[in-house]
Every structure is written in C-alpha cells, then in structure tokens.
C-alpha cells in the first residue's frame, strides 16, 4: 500500500464511490458548458474523462458502466448520480451549520443547568427573613442567568422600563409616545396601553405612595417625560388595569430629558430636567412649579434625587450637586470626556459593611445621608464619585465647602464599546447597558466585570431596571428588565 493510500481516511469501496462521483460531476459540468457550443471540444474533453476513469476506477465493471452512461449516442439516458457530489457537499455544509447551532444551544442549556443548580444550593442555605420567605441578603447577591424568562414586543423602540414595586407588572415606554403595562405571567397582550404623548417618551419613573394620613388612599403613580415638552402624571388603577391621567406639567421650553418622583413624609414632589438647561421641582398634589434653577451651561440629560439634594449630569460633561429648596449649587464633578447620559446616588444600606460604597466612611457622611454617586457617559466609562461635604449650618441652607467643592473619582469601570445609556445598583453589583448591544454586571468591591449579556438585543440597549434595595416599601425580588432599539424588552426572573 502506498503512502497516499495510507493517509487517505477512506476504505477502498468509499474511495471508489468518491472517484465515480467526481467523474460524473466533471462529465455533467462539461456537458453543460461545452457540448452544445463546441462539440469538437466536448468530444476531446469526454475522451479525457473516459481516459481518467481508466486510472481511477479499478473494477472493469465500474469503468464500463461509466462509459455506457456517458455514451453521447443515447440522448435519453440520464445518470441520476451525476450531481451526487455537489448534493453531498451542500448537505455537509448544512449539517455543519446545524451542528454549530446545536452546540451553541447545548452550551446555553448546560449554563442554565449550572445556574439552576447554584440557585438550588443557595436556596438550601437561605435563612428566611422577609415576608416572601427569602433572605434579603441573598436576594441582593442575585445575578440574572444568560437567557431572559420572557420577551415583550412593542411597536417601536423602547426608551424606558420600570418594574411595579410590588406586583409582577412592568411598564414600558416607547419612542412613539406610547405607554404600556404588561403582566409578567401573561405578557402576550398588554394589560393596558395609552398614547400618552405626541412624541417620544424620554424618561419614566414610578412611586407607590405611602401617606400616613388615613384620608388619602395609597396608589401607584407613573410619571412620564417627553420630547413634546410635557410631563404627564398617571395613576395606575390596579382594579381596572388602566392608566388614569391626573395632570400634565407644563413649563419647560425644550425636550424634557428625565423625570424623578419621590415622597418625603406626606409631601410628594417631581423633579425634571430639560434641554433648556433647567431643572424644575413640581408639587405633585397641585402641579405647581416650586423651584427652577440652572445648574449647567448645556443640555441637562439626567437627574437623581435624595432628600433635599439633586445630582444632575449634562451635555457639558460635568455632574453637579444642588440643594434644591434653595437652589444652591454645592459641588461639581469633572472627568468625563463626553456628555453624561445617566447619574444616580448610591444609597446606604444597613448591615452590609462588606459592600464598598454602600456604608458611610465617617459619622459626618452618615448624618448627611449620602457619600457616593455614579455616572455613565458617552465616553464608554462609568465612574463612581465621592461627594465632598458642603458647609452645613443650623437653620440655613447648605453652601459650598470653600476648601473642597470638587467630586473625587474613586473608581472607573471600563469595558463597554460604545455610549453607556443606563445604570442600576443593587447590593454589591452595578448593572449597565450601552449602545454596544450589551448589558454588563460589575462588582462594586473590585471594579471587575462579572458577567456580560451580549445577545439580548439586536440594537442599542436603551434602558434597564431592577428593584431598589434601599426602600422598605418595595418588595425584594430577583428581577431585571431591559429595553432596546429593537422594540423588545427582556425580563429576567428567578
């Protein structure tokens, strides 16, 4: 046996069948391209193929069969195996593609099984301390699995998503100005839908009121901001599953970029920011504008509120802290290279000294109620800042600290490949989404990226939401929802 026969991974029978298939394909190919236009050339080619068959086909019966099947005098004879080789080739390509898909699906399923096994192990170690029988500490350690539990489709790109604080309902706002409510256990048809604005909704926030006055009934409030320069306030009527508009807030002179609603005692306020460079504070009960101030020289893109303080991020690449009742600007953060898309306070949580940034470092910060904030930017980074303490005086509004009025960047997260659109903090994890079509989970303690979801959306990921971990009125659940330019919203549940 020669060396080439030893290297060929075929038996003699398989080699013979392959040779016949090659010869038949060559014969068919030249019949199509040469025979009718250049008969003389075809005869010479056919003669060469017949000669080649003498070398390749070992059995005389096979050679005679090949020659007779390619006899030009018999026009009616058709060799059904002439295209056997290209058919097999095409089948192999399809099979290889199918194998790759099956391997990917298998890998995903194996990952899900590992996640479920981990969850079972964690559940076996849980010490129930909450009303739903789940350890609050372990709830905050939850990282969503690779694939969503359900997928919600709407008519246009999703611009904002919010989870109901207590019920399995997600609110979805779109670029066409529509507002939806979906039941997470039956999401094929929305519970309610409303054309709330004439242009795109840019931001949405929700609050379940907690009035101590028995004469006021508690309910969920949904607030939306839009490119139509308006802010709309809705009451979610759970019994009828519908949005009931309470009022509209008018006053901004350009696109309203973001909106926040919060409650302090029995007072409910709404904050909004706009491309008109202003931030406004509204009274929820009567719709009056209580305060207007201009913290930035360009478009104010994002705000967050904690008590009497507002943090704002702007197109001018800075973020600023303002005491909203007085309008006093207290401190500024510089370090981003491009506009800031999102800002948030990092709230303190009790009994978690092991989590970085969630516990005050000094008693002064503890008494003040805040110390850190986070910002996401178009420069593809996320930064955590330490906020300098202002000068606090009894019975007076705080003023800037004359010796320290600049934020200090203490940690930078790098990994996204495009604009970072939204962020959310839960326990020791920071979740972010970006225009690179990915969602990432970061560890606050180490700054490392722990997990990446790369194929949730086919376009930009515009927004995400998780249950907050600092509000006792919010049921501690393990849920995350994302919204994207592809008109889809992914929901993760444990």
UniProtKB/Swiss-Prot annotation:
WD repeat boundaries on the chain: 153-192, 196-244, 251-292, 295-334, 347-395, 415-454, 457-492
Localisation: Cytoplasm, Cytoskeleton; Cytoplasm, Cytoskeleton, Spindle pole
GO biological processes: cell division; establishment of mitotic spindle orientation; microtubule sliding
InterPro entries: Dynein_regulator_LIS1, G-protein_beta_WD-40_rep, LIS1_N, WD40/YVTN_repeat-like_dom_sf, WD40_repeat_CS, WD40_repeat_dom_sf, WD40_rpt, WD_LIS1/nudF_dynein_reg
Coiled-coil residues: 90-123
SMART domains linked: WD40
Source species, domain of life: Eukaryota
Keywords: Cell cycle, Cell division, Coiled coil, Cytoplasm, Cytoskeleton, Microtubule, Mitosis, Repeat, Transport, WD repeat
MF terms (GO), sorted A to Z: dynein complex binding
Cellular component per GO, a single term: microtubule
Start and end residues of each LisH domain: 14-46
SUBUNIT field: Self-associates. Interacts with NDL1 and dynein.
Protein function: Positively regulates the activity of the minus-end directed microtubule motor protein dynein. Plays a central role in positioning the mitotic spindle at the bud neck during cell division. Targets cytoplasmic dynein to microtubule plus ends, thereby promoting dynein-mediated microtubule sliding along the bud cortex and consequently the movement of the mitotic spindle to the bud neck.
Entry text on domains: Dimerization mediated by the LisH domain may be required to activate dynein.
Family listed: Belongs to the WD repeat LIS1/nudF family.
PANTHER family: WD REPEAT-CONTAINING PROTEIN POP1
Name the record gives this protein: Nuclear distribution protein PAC1
Organism: Saccharomyces cerevisiae (strain Lalvin EC1118 / Prise de mousse)
């Amino acid at each position: 046996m020669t060396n080439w026969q030893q290297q060929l991974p075929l038996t003699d029978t398989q080699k013979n069948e392959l040779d016949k298939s090659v010869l038949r394909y060559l014969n068919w190919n030249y019949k199509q391209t040469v025979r009718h236009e250049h008969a003389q050339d075809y005869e010479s080619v056919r003669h060469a193929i017949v000669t080649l068959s003498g070398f390749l086909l070992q059995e005389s019966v096979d050679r005679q069969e090949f020659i007779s099947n390619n006899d030009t005098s018999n026009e009616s004879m058709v060799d059904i195996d002439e295209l056997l080789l290209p058919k097999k080739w095409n089948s192999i390509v399809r099979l290889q593609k199918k194998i790759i898909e099956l391997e990917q699906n298998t890998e995903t399923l194996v990952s899900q099984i590992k996640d479920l096994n981990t969850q079972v192990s964690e559940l076996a170690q849980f010490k129930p301390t909450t009303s739903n029988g789940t350890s609050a500490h372990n709830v905050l350690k939850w990282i969503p699995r690779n694939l969503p539990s359900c997928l919600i489709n709407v008519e246009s790109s999703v611009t904002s998503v919010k989870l109901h604080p207590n019920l399995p309902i997600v609110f979805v706002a779109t670029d066409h100005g529509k507002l939806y409510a979906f039941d997470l256990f039956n999401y094929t048809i929305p519970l309610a839908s409303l054309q709330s604005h004439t242009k795109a909704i840019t931001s949405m926030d929700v609050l379940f009121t907690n009035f101590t006055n028995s004469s006021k009934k508690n309910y969920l409030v949904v607030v939306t901001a839009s490119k139509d320069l308006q802010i709309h306030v809705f009451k979610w009527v759970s019994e009828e599953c519908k949005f009931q508009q309470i009022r509209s807030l008018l006053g901004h002179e350009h696109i309203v970029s973001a909106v926040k609603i919060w409650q302090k005692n029995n007072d409910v306020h709404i904050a909004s920011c706009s491309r008109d460079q202003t931030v406004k504070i509204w009274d929820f009960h009567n719709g009056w504008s209580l305060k207007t101030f201009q913290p930035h020289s360009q478009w104010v893109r994002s705000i967050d509120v904690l008590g009497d303080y507002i943090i704002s991020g702007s197109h001018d690449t800075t973020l600023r802290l303002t005491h909203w009742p007085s309008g006093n600007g207290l401190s500024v953060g510089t370090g981003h290279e491009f506009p800031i898309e999102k800002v948030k306070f990092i709230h303190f949580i009790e009994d978690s000294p092991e989590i970085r940034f969630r516990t005050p470092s000094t008693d002064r910060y503890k008494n003040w109620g805040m110390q850190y904030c986070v910002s996401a930017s178009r420069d593809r980074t996320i930064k955590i800042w330490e906020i300098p303490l202002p000068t606090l005086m009894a019975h007076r509004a705080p003023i800037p600290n004359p010796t320290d009025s600049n934020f200090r960047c203490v940690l930078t997260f790098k990994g996204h490949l495009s604009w970072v659109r939204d962020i959310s903090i839960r326990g020791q994890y920071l979740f972010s989404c970006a225009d690179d079509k990915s969602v990432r989970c970061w560890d606050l303690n180490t700054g490392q990226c722990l997990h990446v979801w790369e194929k949730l959306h086919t376009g930009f990921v515009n927004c995400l939401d998780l249950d907050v971990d600092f509000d006792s009125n919010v049921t501690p659940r393990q849920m995350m929802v994302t919204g994207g330019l592809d008109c889809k919203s992914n929901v993760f549940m444990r």
